[in-house]
Amino acid sequence: MSKVLVEAKGMGLRSTPYKLNLVADLIRGKPVSVAVMYLKFCKKKSARYISKVLKSAIANAQANYSVDVDNLYIKEVLVGKSFSLRRIHARARGKACRVYKHYGNVIIKLFERV
């Protein structure tokens, strides 16, 4: 196994960490070509965000280390919590409730298997 480890980050993605993690579970440990196909046909909105980060990681690997895409595998997909926007939701009798709009972070690490 080679020591080439490529990383790409997607910060402040407009999806909750739970929803991002549902899609991230599909591609953990898979070859990059298979993972791209999984994300292409996944109907979830978070799949688009993770797909963009994965394509960025692939581009980083090709540009910085000139590795072959067929040898790249996903080592880990880290999903975390980012900031939360607080909004006001008007309720009955002049009351108001807070609504939290949660955002998430995704970090994808790739390695080259020879």
From Swiss-Prot:
Membrane spanning residue stretches: none
Annotated HAMAP family: Ribosomal_uL22_B (MF_01331_B)
Taxonomic source organism: Ehrlichia ruminantium (strain Gardel)
Disulfide bonds: none
Record-given protein name: Large ribosomal subunit protein uL22
PANTHER family noted in UniProt: CHLOROPLAST 50S RIBOSOMAL PROTEIN L22-RELATED, LARGE RIBOSOMAL SUBUNIT PROTEIN UL22M
Any one cellular-component term (Gene Ontology): cytosolic large ribosomal subunit
Family statement drawn from the similarity comment of this UniProt entry: Belongs to the universal ribosomal protein uL22 family.
Molecular function in Gene Ontology: rRNA binding; structural constituent of ribosome
Binding partners and assembly: Part of the 50S ribosomal subunit.
One GO term of the biological process aspect: translation
Role of this protein: This protein binds specifically to 23S rRNA; its binding is stimulated by other ribosomal proteins, e.g. L4, L17, and L20. It is important during the early stages of 50S assembly. It makes multiple contacts with different domains of the 23S rRNA in the assembled 50S subunit and ribosome.
CDD domains linked to this entry: Ribosomal_L22 (cd00336)
NCBIfam families with a match to the protein in the record: rplV_bact
SUPFAM superfamilies noted in UniProt: Ribosomal protein L22
Gene: rplV
InterPro entries assigned to the protein according to its UniProt record, in alphabetical order: Ribosomal_uL22, Ribosomal_uL22_bac/chlpt-type, Ribosomal_uL22_bac/org-type, Ribosomal_uL22_CS, Ribosomal_uL22_sf
PROSITE patterns tied to this protein: RIBOSOMAL_L22
Key words, A-Z: Ribonucleoprotein, Ribosomal protein, RNA-binding, rRNA-binding
Superkingdom assignment: Bacteria
